[in-house]
């Protein structure tokens, strides 16, 4: 079960097997199809959950893709780095699909998907920006915290530059203020590779994602 989906009703789905019907929550059933979700703010709890799910799916089959659906406003930089790092660590490729929004740390995770397998739906919104230093306390502690925020921002700039093919100077300039992008703009920027169009007009990205093993899109 996706414990990160808080304060909501999680649907139950009946799956017919040779041993009879079995009830699953919807997220557990989709996990069997190698589909995982980032559907809330990025915090330690959701990061730990996604890391565990990705590692489990790698152990199940290191040759098959994992499909990570993203609808998140972002959140904690460290938690985002944890998800990003495990995506790069596992042997199987992680395809990323943005639905709704992928902002801040979630945009970094989106961009960190396997090359050629980073997607967004047509009305998705992506936003990149530098880290926030909102903190209180003794001046020296605030100075230490600010240095750490700047270091984390520099690392995020390096990651975005690596996955978009842009220079660190360009990325640093672009994130000085919140930069919102449409799916088309995110593709031009290099954060995603393709836009998944509606099913009635099946796109090459749709076919590629389906061929990669996502039965939900077939």
Regions from the language model: what does each represent?
Residues 1-105, 111-218:
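N-terminal organellar transit peptides
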């Amino acid at each position: 079960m996706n414990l990160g989906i808080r304060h909501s009703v999680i649907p139950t789905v009946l799956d017919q097997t040779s041993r009879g019907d079995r009830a699953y929550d919807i997220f557990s059933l989709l996990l069997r199809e190698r589909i995982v979700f980032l559907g809330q703010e990025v915090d330690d709890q959701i990061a730990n959950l996604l890391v565990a799910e990705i590692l489990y799916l790698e152990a199940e089959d290191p040759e098959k893709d994992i499909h990570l659906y993203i609808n998140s406003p972002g959140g904690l930089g460290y938690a985002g780095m944890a998800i990003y790092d495990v995506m790069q660590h596992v042997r199987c490729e992680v395809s990323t699909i943005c639905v709704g929004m992928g902002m801040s740390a979630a945009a970094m995770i989106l961009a960190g998907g396997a090359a050629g397998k980073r997607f967004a739906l047509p009305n998705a919104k992506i936003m990149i920006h530098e880290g926030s230093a909102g903190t209180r306390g003794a001046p020296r502690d605030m100075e230490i915290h600010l240095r750490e925020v700047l270091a984390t921002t520099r690392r995020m700039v390096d990651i975005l530059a690596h996955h978009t093919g842009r220079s660190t100077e360009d990325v640093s300039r672009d994130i000085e203020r919140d930069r919102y992008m449409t799916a088309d703009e995110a593709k031009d920027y290099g954060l995603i590779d393709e836009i998944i169009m509606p099913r009635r007009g099946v796109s090459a990205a749709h076919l590629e994602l389906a061929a990669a093993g996502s039965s939900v899109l077939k």
